[in-house]
Amino acid sequence: MSLHRLILSLLVAVGLSSCAIVPGDGGQGETTRWTMLMVSPKDDVADCHLIRLPDGRKVLIDAGKLGDSPGAALAAVQAQNITALDLVILSHFHIDHYGALWDLIEAGITIKRVAINVPVQAAADQEKGWGCNLDHVRATLKKLDDHHIPYFTPKTGERILETTTAQGTVVALDVICLYDGLNSPIGLTDVNETSMIVRLSHGSTRALFTGDLGGRLGAYLATSNFDLKADILKVPHHGSEGCAPNEFFDRVGAKAVLVPAPKNLWASGRSMRIRNYFIEHHIPTYVSALRGNVTAVLTATDFRIESER
């Protein structure tokens, strides 16, 4: 291994890619801000992403809850001075992606609507005792009903939110695809493969949210006709093995990636393939446990990345 590659490998392994220079806003006016909230301070994994739109609306993608830091998501959201959310998107029903929704509601944060994708019984039953708990999912939906919070399941290709800036730039959230765990192009899947794939666009600048997209569906999408191109990628499955294959990353073609992962997991062998891919492709990599809150600032033609450390 050359000295250059060795240095680059070490930098990406700790989430400090030497290619961290990214485009700026270029004076493009209003911005959309996506903050990957740091909710993995110990060893458990979770996802929680806050989007602030130019018109003032706020969206949360996932609200994960961890066994070793159960209050992390609520604390992170409250630290952003959030009292109301116009939309919450739950990518899929694993507790590390939706468990803190209860906490947000009980803390008095107003939630206007929730986008969900409940897996079929056959998919959930494969994970009894360790993965998706449909009884808890039903209890969560009842909690939404009890608090008069509407929820819905979008369709593939549906635009679930749109606004236009003063400069005439369209900002939107689009559902690229979602499957229920049975009616999919690869048949019966696990619950990770029911992850709602969502694209945030601000003009021509794009960010792709992938939940815990796994290897089988990821391989299918890599050869599909879906438009997966994005400037910034939320790496699926906390950047660990079992996530989408390298061919999926090729299709996305991201210029920067955000990884919601604890430090030990990212440094482990479980993340080696993913780490090495971004090293070899010289893609700036931002890991939440190492960089704290990481914010992607999107403009009509560009983006920049900011982090706490």
Give residue ranges: language-model regions.
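Extracytoplasmic/secreted envelope proteins and their assembly/folding machinery
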Residues: 48, 70-74, 98-102, 134-141, ...
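Core dinuclear metal-dependent hydrolase active-site scaffold
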Residues: 21-84, 145-229, 292-309
